[in-house]
Swiss-Prot record:
Keywords: Ribonucleoprotein, Ribosomal protein, RNA-binding, rRNA-binding, tRNA-binding. Gene3D superfamilies: 3.30.1440.10. The keyword Zinc-finger does not apply. Disulfide bonds: none annotated. This is Large ribosomal subunit protein uL5. Belongs to the universal ribosomal protein uL5 family. It comes from Actinobacillus succinogenes (strain ATCC 55618 / DSM 22257 / CCUG 43843 / 130Z). This is one of the proteins that bind and probably mediate the attachment of the 5S RNA into the large ribosomal subunit, where it forms part of the central protuberance. In the 70S ribosome it contacts protein S13 of the 30S subunit (bridge B1b), connecting the 2 subunits; this bridge is implicated in subunit movement. Contacts the P site tRNA; the 5S rRNA and some of its associated proteins might help stabilize positioning of ribosome-bound tRNAs. The gene is rplE. The keyword Acyltransferase does not apply. GO terms for biological process: translation.
């Protein structure tokens, strides 16, 4: 079992229960899922770029990504409905906790010119979204084999009712918010 999951059960639940005066342990917010999304718009011209993006995301997450397709045709971008334009992975359970631990302890500190993550990236319902400009911050990616530096979106979905609870949950895991 992941260390952060044990830490959540043993420490964070009690901390948040007293802080927000919850009647039941089940009211305490928890991380539901983590979604990784990589948009590969250049895949229209070169299909190999999408395959490389899928391989990168599979290495980062530990599971096979789903290839996302365009929902509608947009003439300005020269895409048609059904064209593959990206890939995504939804992590839950054990893999989610392991990824979250690697994200906080290894990947985020390796971001170039890192001064902390913005606390304004909450969506109003306690979910946190962040963008990563380079996939090479993850140790699973071999820097020499990277064909192109790609970014990805990371969304942490929680059961928190509002941003304050969501921020308290992530801060309890020492999430590196900007001061």
């Amino acid at each position: 079992m992941a260390k952060l999951h044990d830490y959540y059960r043993d420490q964070v639940v009690n901390e948040l229960k007293t802080k927000f005066n919850y009647a039941s342990v089940m009211q305490v917010p928890r991380i539901e899922k983590i979604t990784l999304n990589m948009g590969v718009g250049e895949a229209l011209t070169d299909k190999k770029l999408l395959d490389n993006a899928v391989a990168d995301l599979a290495a980062i997450s530990g599971q096979k990504p789903l290839i996302t397709k365009a929902r509608k045709s947009v003439a300005g971008f020269k895409i048609r409905q059904g064209y593959p334009i990206g890939c995504k992975v939804t992590l839950r359970g054990e893999r989610m906790w392991e990824f979250f631990e690697r994200l906080i302890t290894i990947a985020v500190p390796r971001i170039r010119d890192f001064r902390g993550l913005s606390a304004k990236s909450f969506d109003g319902r306690g979910n946190y979204s962040m963008g990563v400009r380079e996939q090479i911050i993850f140790p699973e990616i071999d820097y020499d084999k990277v064909d192109r530096v790609r970014g990805l979106d990371i969304t942490i979905t929680t059961t928190a009712k509002n941003d304050e609870e969501g921020q308290a949950l992530l801060a309890a895991f020492n999430f590196p918010f900007r001061k």
